[in-house]
A protein has these predicted regions:
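Small/aliphatic-rich secondary-structure junction motif
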Residues: 2-50, 73
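Charged helix-capping and loop-helix junction motifs
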Residues: 21-22, 54-55, 89-92, 118-122
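Residue-level recognition of beta-strand->loop/alpha-helix junctions
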Residues: 39, 78-80, 137
């Protein structure tokens, strides 16, 4: 049913992903799917990396570490943006088609009142692509 799973990764906030990583591993093993870990960074130095190449190396290391856990094929794909916060949703939507993704698994937060004004990334991605989107909330 699913062949290519995409997992958006924010290397500055890996702890937010913890609840979704087990789901990613289980789904990938169940469907014998490959996993693409996708990151979006700026061209300017930031808290994670000084350059997009350094960011890619760190995302690749993260992907390989996850491969050691679940054994499924992994790739890392980095997109650069002048404003990652403003552009992340559009970049993720475009990458789904570019990478031939059929399932996106994203960590999400508990609903907040602010979501009415500023919807979540997962909600935007789900409404702008044909791929299935699985949102994983943090466990208490």
């Amino acid at each position: 049913m699913f062949n290519n799973i995409m997992v958006p990764v924010d290397l500055a906030h890996i702890e937010v992903l913890e609840s979704s990583l087990g789901v990613v591993a289980d789904m990938a093993k169940h469907y014998d799917a490959s996993i693409t870990y996708v990151g979006v960074t700026s061209n300017a130095p930031n808290s994670v990396a000084r350059t997009p190449d350094e960011y890619h190396q760190k995302l690749e290391a993260f992907a390989q570490k996850r491969h050691d856990v679940h054994g499924q094929p992994v790739t890392a794909k980095v997109y650069t943006s002048t404003d990652p916060v403003a552009n992340i949703d559009d970049i993720l939507v475009k990458s789904i088609d570019e990478l031939d993704i059929d399932l996106v698994i994203m960590a999400t937060h508990l609903p907040r009142h602010l979501d009415i004004v500023m919807p979540s990334h997962g909600g935007k991605v789900a409404t702008h692509t044909d791929a299935s989107v699985f949102l994983v909330r943090p466990q208490n």
